[in-house]
Design a protein with these regions (language model features):
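Asp-box/BNR beta-propeller blade signature and adjacent active/binding-site loops
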Residues: 1-357
Length: 357
């Protein structure tokens, strides 16, 4: 398989501020009206700060140009990972998650940043957390032009759920941790999310092993109903992807199996191309830093791994790629990374194609 990368550019940043200019953890999809929609956490100070908002950019020309970022979710807490999924005739779900005020104070305690501390002091902590703390989502019923109120789920994942044949959404994610700490009952669980925001528990995926955290999964449902889940599994010195499958609609899952080396990279995003090929793109946080992908020609039974899309990263704060197929058959992948040594992370786009050797 030959890989041809023919475009890379920055598509989402903040030219008006050197302070609130960090963007990360994007997702991209094609809406029902043909436009592309990219969401991310933006207008941040840095990787961990209380100022994150979920923003959206739109493209009407297959990613040649994008609108400026518009805010979709903005709670008093730190709105992180942006996920997006269209479903039904005109509905669009945008997902995020946040963490507690305590977590923000704990993370930023070494910096003693008066700006951050002043903001945290201004929050009505109890009221904000009672209303917003959790894995959050909003729903649009007009192809992403307007969105309803913030609602919450018990699980979280970077790129959001996937549509089911019956009109619901299959939401497979890590159980939400309010302080972003490893919990005793931490695991990956499957839920069915309905269009009205209600949900029901389906099943669980067993953890790989004690001491290894399973988190940040992404899911795909194949035409025959097979469900494939790629899971980030990590601890210090271990950062890779495992795969689990379900053949009964998410009620039960196979024991996760390792796909990459112990430092192979994560988290992943799965996409089925028009010819049936599956691709799973993931961040690579070892030198040379960048974005890689694997592909499968047999519905995820086997994978050809460690194909490089981009390897010019300036450090390990990058990744979370997400892909969509363009009308001409090419693939558009978004991810986050710094553009310069001194600059903040911004959202990048790559256009590429796979051809037979």
């Amino acid at each position: 398989m030959n890989i041809q990368v023919f475009e890379k550019k920055v598509i989402c940043f903040n030219p008006d501020s050197q302070l609130h200019s960090y963007f990360a953890w994007p997702s991209v999809t094609r809406l029902q009206d043909g436009r592309l929609m990219m969401v991310a956490s933006g207008f941040r100070l840095k990787h961990i700060c209380p100022f994150g908002k979920v923003v959206a950019c739109f493209s009407e020309d297959e990613g040649e140009t994008w609108t400026k970022p518009a805010v979709i979710i903005d709670t008093p807490l730190d709105d992180r990972d942006g996920g997006v999924v269209p479903f039904g005739e005109k509905s669009v779900l945008v997902t995020s998650f946040n963490n507690s005020v305590w977590a923000q104070r704990n993370w930023n305690s070494n910096n003693n940043d008066p700006y951050i501390n002043a903001y945290l002091d201004s929050i009505d902590e109890k009221a904000a957390e009672e209303k917003y703390l959790g894995s959050t989502f909003v729903i649009s019923h007009d192809c992403g032009r307007t969105f309803g109120p913030v609602m919450r789920m018990p699980v979280t994942c970077p790129h959001g759920p996937v549509p089911m044949k019956d009109g619901g959404l299959l939401y497979i994610g890590r159980t939400f941790s309010p302080h972003n700490l490893v919990m005793e009952d931490d695991h990956i669980a499957a839920y069915k999310l309905n269009e009205d925001g209600t949900y029901e528990k389906l099943g669980d995926i067993e953890n790989v092993a004690p001491g290894l955290l399973s988190c940040e999964p992404h899911t795909i449902i194949l035409p025959d109903g097979k469900i494939i889940v790629h899971i980030r599994v990590h601890k210090r010195g271990f950062f890779t992807i495992f795969q689990s499958e379900s053949y009964d609609g998410g009620m039960t899952f196979t024991k996760p199996r390792q796909l990459l080396g112990d430092q192979g990279g994560a988290p992943a995003h799965l996409l089925r191309l028009n010819d049936g090929t599956l691709i799973s793109a993931y961040g690579y946080r070892e030198e040379p830093y960048g974005v890689r992908f694997m592909y499968s020609k047999d519905n995820g039974e086997t994978w050809s791994t460690e194909h490089v899309l981009w390897d010019q990263g300036l450090g390990n704060d990058l990744g979370y790629p997400c892909s969509v197929q363009l009308n001409n058959g090419d693939i558009l992948t978004v991810f986050y990374a710094r553009e310069t040594e001194e600059g903040p992370a911004v959202i990048h786009q790559i256009k590429w194609r796979m051809t037979a050797e």
